[in-house]
Amino acid sequence: MIDNLQPLRGMKDLLPDDYQVHNYIINKARDVGVLYGYKQMSTPILEYTRVFNRCMGDSSDVISKEIYSFVDKSNNAIALRPEFTSGIIRSFISNGLHHKLPLKLFSTGPVFRYDRPQAGRQRQFHQLNYEYLGAKGAITDAETLKLAVDILKALEIEEDTTLELNSLGCSESRIVYQQKLVEYLNDFKDKLSGESKIRLNKNPMRILDSKSEIDQKIIANAPILSDYHTNESKKYFDELLKYLDILGIKYSINPRLVRGLDYYCHTVFEFTTQKLGSQATILAGGRYDMLSRIMGNYDVHAIGFAAGIERIALMKKYNIFVIKPVFVLPIGKNNICYALDIVDKLRLHNIISIIDPIGKIAKRIQRVLNEDAKFIIFVGDEEKMNNNLKFKDLKNQKEYIIDLEKVLELLK
């Protein structure tokens, strides 16, 4: 006997009721994406670790602390995907999809991060992911943000979220800003948290994303990135804001927003909520024009975002309409074949049907009631002989002796 039959810490079973909610969220989001021209694709859950190291940066929290990476039996370093974008870009390059640009791609599935489990944050969780490859110009940023807003509206949570927006500018802007930021932070080097002291040498902009109270006090007076934007970067961001205003999208500019991954440039954004405590981010993303060059020496303008399905499910209790099955109960073994024929014909008419031939009839009826079913069909000797059925409506407790055609009419 196995001593511990619990799932791994930070990983949960998705039971049928959970899956109904997940599928509802996925289908709603997918349908909105289809209206924008997005097509679904998937990549393997496992990739070579170098794919994520190269894309996300060694100094990112995901790579330095959270990635599930190990050596397989062929001595390859492989990893469970911690996000979708790296795998999508790898697939884009390895499948030679450059001639198909622009591409709008939707993916969904589990991702994995070794993090401290808490409400809204698990080590295995599920995401909705949208990537727009070949997305050039601020207008595509605006369209992507409109897609995100429309998805949140379809899921009935848009009013409970706030769009926080920032511009990281171009690479020239960030180089100048990073120098100024390091100069400022060096004056507080001894006061920074241990983690930020390491980041100061590797990726100082990531300190702006620190959750440490000590760091936050220091960051409060740090230089502002937008003050060092080139004219090109300023023009790009101003154009985006103009489009958002035209589209009626409300936003709040957060000059400290940098996102947690190294591949972003220009536009970065988060949709946050007050309903989930510390796990405030529901949907987030940004522009990553340099990522395809980092991976495969190709220049592809791109923007995308991901949303956490578990967090969306925590925000709203969805009243999902579930079609209840019809239960067919044969009375006596000699009527099982007739019952199987009835079930088969019901399914041919797209009616969810379950046959339950085992056990005493009272216990079988109780199982039906436990499933909150609405209808039972009894098949006994008399019904078989007369080629009809005993149909019971559990809501009004009425029984009818009718043929299959009449049953089909009642169930449609």
Swiss-Prot record:
Transmembrane segments: none annotated. GO terms for cellular component: cytoplasm. PROSITE patterns: AA_TRNA_LIGASE_II (PS50862). One of its GO terms (biological process) is histidyl-tRNA aminoacylation. It catalyses: tRNA(His) + L-histidine + ATP = L-histidyl-tRNA(His) + AMP + diphosphate + H(+). GO terms for molecular function: ATP binding; histidine-tRNA ligase activity. It is found in: Cytoplasm. Its EC number is 6.1.1.21. Gene3D superfamilies: Anticodon-binding domain (3.40.50.800), Bira Bifunctional Protein, Domain 2 (3.30.930.10). Keywords: Aminoacyl-tRNA synthetase, ATP-binding, Cytoplasm, Ligase, Nucleotide-binding, Protein biosynthesis. Homodimer. Belongs to the class-II aminoacyl-tRNA synthetase family. PANTHER family: HISTIDINE--TRNA LIGASE, MITOCHONDRIAL-RELATED, HISTIDYL-TRNA SYNTHETASE. This is Histidine--tRNA ligase.
